[in-house]
Amino acid sequence: DLEAEFKEKPVTQDPNAIEEDRGGVEVPDGYVYDPSRGALHDYCTNSPDQFPAPGVNADFSGACAIHDMCYEKDYGNADAMVACDTAFLKNLRTVCKAVYTSALDPRLSGCLNTADTYYKAVVAVHPKNYFR
């Protein structure tokens, strides 16, 4: 039932979710999670909201929500959108480094590579912001 699926709470709003998995990058209070409203209201759109790893998953929902809100506020302003993308990468990497704290932990490099891929995907979807 599609309607029931949209009524489910996302993992980051679940009271049982572990805050440390978000690395201090929280979903802003004003964020509206509603995929029926489009890509700016569904966390990480067509990508997983978490970096899956043995043990603890790094939760990117906060970073994606902040990026969604930034784009919604500044859509059409190329310079502002580039700043949104830069902050997005920083937030994703912050989550990775907070969740996987040892440089020797292979999950850290995997998470950082995933963060870079998410950033590159966003840039690829909006090339006009970069090539003007």
Task: List each model region and its residues.
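Extended terminal accessory/targeting regions
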Residues: 1-132
